[in-house]
A protein has these predicted regions:
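Lipid interaction determinants
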Residues: 1-139
Length: 139
């Protein structure tokens, strides 16, 4: 079971990117994108615009475990097929409602050494049936 202090929703604190990361006690889902992403020039994106949209919006989900300050993330689904077999490993620091994650390995070679700062999203209550984690299953 993961460290309960990480469970919840977090927003990326960054001048250049936006992002949301959601943690349950065993799973995570993260989406990040550049703040200055180009919109398509028309109602429908051109092939080049569609590729650029995909490359500038990173999405990853899977399972994770925290041991001490080390977080290890195993990807179940992500937008970077070339990194699918690489777990993400890094150091977590949580101070109040701020979490910092320093990537040691995994992700892509350009992410090693990167530091991400997240701010906890306040809870708004539990009076909706949608609260929780949902896994897509085939019929």
């Amino acid at each position: 079971m993961a460290d309960d202090s990480i469970v919840g929703a977090w927003e990326l604190v960054s001048d250049s990117r936006v992002g949301v990361s959601i943690y349950t006690d065993s799973h995570f889902s993260t989406v990040m994108a550049a703040k200055n992403r180009q919109r398509s020039s028309g109602e429908r994106a051109t092939p080049d615009e569609a590729l650029e949209a995909l490359l500038t919006c990173q999405a990853v989900s899977g399972t994770y475990a925290v041991s001490g300050s080390t977080g290890t993330y195993t990807k179940v689904a992500n937008t970077r097929a070339e990194t699918s077999d690489q777990p993400i490993v890094g150091n977590h620091t949580i101070n109040g409602d701020t979490m910092t994650f320093n990537i040691r390995s995994g992700g892509s070679s350009t992410n090693a050494g990167a530091s991400l700062t997240w701010s906890r999203v306040p809870s708004v209550g539990t009076d909706t049936p949608l609260i929780g984690a949902w896994e897509l299953v085939d019929d």
